Amino acid sequence: RGEVYLPKAGFHKLNEERAAEGLPVFANPRNAAAGSVRQLDPRITAKRPLDIYIYGLGWAEGRTMPETHSETMKYLQSLGFRINPRNALAKTIEEAEAYYANWEEKRNGLPYEADGVVVKIDSLALQEELGSVGSEPRWAIAYKFPAVQGTTRLKEISVSVGRTGTLNPVAILEPVSVGGVTIRNAALH
């Protein structure tokens, strides 16, 4: 398992090339990476400067499996897979909290966009014992950084009709850029 991402430098270069070709530019690296992975033409995807960090191993036939997640990461790295060099093993809750606080402060200096930190139980046996609920593991939790915010003005409130005929209020906003995405409307609940 792993996560495909688009480094910020590659994102800027890709957008420069797209603009020069008269194509629409991507809003942000995360959306560009997600769209690239879903791209129906693999030749287009192959031309994009995507990268990947591996964070898990399902099963390796004929080999004794590591007992911990941290050992798994070392094993995968020894095979030549790219592992995030910022991974760390925290032995206490306080160490995990300090790790989160450190990266919350440094997130804008990372070569890729990050929206939080994932904390996992290191023991694979304990991970197995805890299991998952649906696709959500009970042995890992994502601590998200505070959301990027923007300020704008409410121009008006309109009403849209939902697919079941319900009337839904919608805020019409002065456009504001938040995380590289221009927001013009917002659902009101």
Give residue spans per PLM region.
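RNA/tRNA-interacting regions in translation and RNA-turnover enzymes
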Residues: 1-189
